[in-house]
Amino acid sequence: MEGCETRGQLYYHPAYLFAIIFQGTSGYLTFPILFIILKKYAFKVYYHPNLVFLMMLNVVSCLLLGGLTAWSATNFFLNLMIKPSPCDLLLKTYFCSKIRGTFLFAFCLVTTSHAGILLERSWATYSVKNYERQGRALGTILAIVAVAVAATAIFILLLPEDGEEMITTCLTFSASKSIGSRVYVMFFVQLLLDAVISIVHLVLYRYNKNIDKHGSTSLSEQFQRNENVKTLKQVTPLLILSNVTIGVYIFIVSVFRLYKDYLPPNWYEIIAANLFIMPHMPFMFTSLILVELWLGKKRQDRIHKDMMASQDVPLDDQFHIAMENWDVHFQSRLKAQARANRKPLSANWTSSTLITKFKKRQTTVAVISIPPSPS
């Protein structure tokens, strides 16, 4: 009972309250940002259907992560208001089992969907000549595989979970005695996978950006490569953010975990809650996507404005320029035709001249060879 009361005191610690409020705020802010993205940009981005399927997985992941984070924080403060004693504030793990599994599944789905986007863009780069005419089978298969891999990984991770273990919130992972170490392993595997994906993304981005600077390929290939560049440019910051946040979290919390037994009661949980960056990642992901889309729109408007400014010529001048161009092209074409016809005309003229001279010579010889008539 004494240990229960000691753990229940976490609910009243200012540093722990700050961590929960911060997490809940991030969760709630995810939804208006997603609404802005879907309203302003979702129907103005014309990507291949395969890519759209995989990017929608990221949207679903952000919705799940943001929603569960907001729910966990709300449930925390509701319990704080209605539960009378510290022991009543604690939750049994079986109450949160599905919520924890869904949160970890959504977080793992972020990485597997990024891997799917990498494979899809790699195939789009390889078959750039005919990828636009290919169907939606690749995107559907990659999306199913991404969901299946994430679900299988979380199912294996939660197998040793103790349903009777007492926890403060449903998103308490690192302090869990039954699955805490396994969650760290999953985060570390995600960190390695995201690092590999980031490197390959960078290679694909530079290849697609530099392969056709002179526009020597077909218009369809140029469009597909441009789509590759835009997509990889948008996804790469998300991968970098994921690598940095997970890496920093694993490193710092692992160090504190070594000295867990030497810290005052509840202080490891307080430190872990304030450093637990995963509940903030949907807010950071959506914010990065919104900023990238806004910068892309601003860049596109500037390019369009510069193009219009370079063509800002009065109407009469445009007419004269067009007429001059027509005259120039007509004269050059006429001269080319004349040069092409000059050689055959010269040959015909030479042969006809020789025939005429030959006939005249025959006539002259014939006249000279006529004998005189007798008188």
UniProtKB/Swiss-Prot annotation:
One of its GO terms (molecular function) is olfactory receptor activity. InterPro entries: 7TM_GPCR_serpentine_rcpt_Srab, Nematode_rcpt-like_serp_alpha. GO terms for biological process: detection of chemical stimulus involved in sensory perception. It comes from the Eukaryota. One of its GO terms (cellular component) is membrane. It is a multi-pass membrane protein. The chain crosses the membrane at residues 17-37, 51-71, 99-119, 138-158, 183-203, 236-256, 275-295. Keywords: Membrane, Transmembrane, Transmembrane helix. Signal peptide: none annotated. Pfam families: 7TM_GPCR_Srab. It is found in: Membrane. Belongs to the nematode receptor-like protein sra family. PANTHER family: G_PROTEIN_RECEP_F1_2 DOMAIN-CONTAINING PROTEIN-RELATED (PTHR31357:SF16), SERPENTINE RECEPTOR CLASS ALPHA-10 (PTHR31357). This is Serpentine receptor class alpha-39. It comes from Caenorhabditis elegans. The gene is sra-39.
